[in-house]
Amino acid sequence: MSPRRPLVVLYLVDGARPDVMQELLASGDLPNIRREIVESGTSRTASSCFPSTTGPAYLPFLMGCFPGTSNIPGIRWLDKAEFHAKRWGTNRFRSYNGIEAPWFNDDLPGERPTIFERFERPFNVYSMLTRGLPRGHNLTGRTKLMWYLYAHFTDRWHPVDRAGHHHLMRSLDGSPDFVFAVFPGVDSYSHLLHPRHEETLAAYRYVDFSVGQLVARLKRLGRWDDTLVIITSDHGLTATGQHLDLATFLEERGLKTLSYPIIWKANPEASVMISGNAMGQVYCLNGNSGAALVAGEVGAALGSRLEELLAREEIDFAAWRHGKGAYEIAAARGRAVIRSTPEGLTYQPTSGDPFGLGTLATPLDRRRALEATFDSEYPDALVQIEQLFECGRTGDLVVASRNGFDLRKAYEWPEHHSSHGSLHREHMIVPLLYNRTGWDPRPARTADLFNTILKWSGKPTVAGTDGEPLC
């Protein structure tokens, strides 16, 4: 008999939209989740992070930190200081979408613990963040690449989810105390087809099947009463009908631009790094210091291209550093400045109101900043803009596309029919379901789950993270 110990199982249903999940719960398509999780527990939502994209958006769960705090500001990024200092340095730029994915763990700040390092018997299924796992506990370490390549070239992701479920069930043989299991099918079929395509909905239903199998097994083992099951996502997404390739936009306007997969160019003037396809970072490289551009320096480097970009129908907004602790938001509908002071964050429209928040002149701490924006079109906008631009690897200009559009077309195979990554609520708000009640009902961030899991498990919480325990 396995020793009794608290167990946490976190289902990361990549790309799950809360409205789709609620519709499927209401229609009876998710009977196991309804019976075992919702009826005896809680169904709510949480705010993710910016960029809202796979990989960086796993960091709040597994480290309690936002992408900027973790020095990983996107699924692709460039380090200007490294780029200017080392012609052939391996840390000049990164894309975790390809062969550089194994460097994800090495790129994390070593002083910040992962959740795997806080448990005695943690297991992982499909997450690219694996630092701290005991030998043999990364259950898909040897097979993930094979499965993901198979699915990429065949457009068949259901077998990947089925294999993940097999490994999740296998983890129960190892007396686990924490299991992080990614189910990529919802996200992948949404990209390939549509967020509500039947193949996508079938991926939601398979998660329900997995939950039913898991709970039945835990009951047979006598562990169910001591188990916390959390079902959530790293981001939402929206259907995409048109693409504006941001790198091509700059290249066609006379700016020699470096972007993946063509990352070796002589004397590039700019670089574009896309995340989730709805968020892009522009790095201006026509200087030698490697320093981030501030205020008018961004417009001077990009010239008329910046105003032309902002006027395009595909663009929702752009943002850049306005000065120390200040960030400018620009859109066709207006401009605003977010300021960070020792007392908190403010939002001041200077023309129009790009985020639709009105004037927030009284400084707000991080909790109140979330409360003030949670129900808006840009949840947690003040905190997310701040955390991103406080990262030295973040671009000089951050661009978000409007829903229905994205920022990458060249070399994108297969074509994306859904996108995410932006600060819009349909990308930021994710489902949060768990088989417990009585937790703090305040607006939640996915970053809150790191210390929530530790506290529920009877372990010390970690100071200096971007979240607070909910229980």
Regions found by a protein language model. Name each.
Residues 12, 45, 121-127, 178-182, ...:
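A structural signal for short, well-ordered beta-strand segments and their strand-loop junctions
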Residues 58-198, 203-206, 328-375, 394, ...:
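His/Asp/Glu-rich, glycine-adjacent segments
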Residues 267-440, 446, 450:
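Active-site neighborhoods of enzymes that stabilize oxyanions during catalysis
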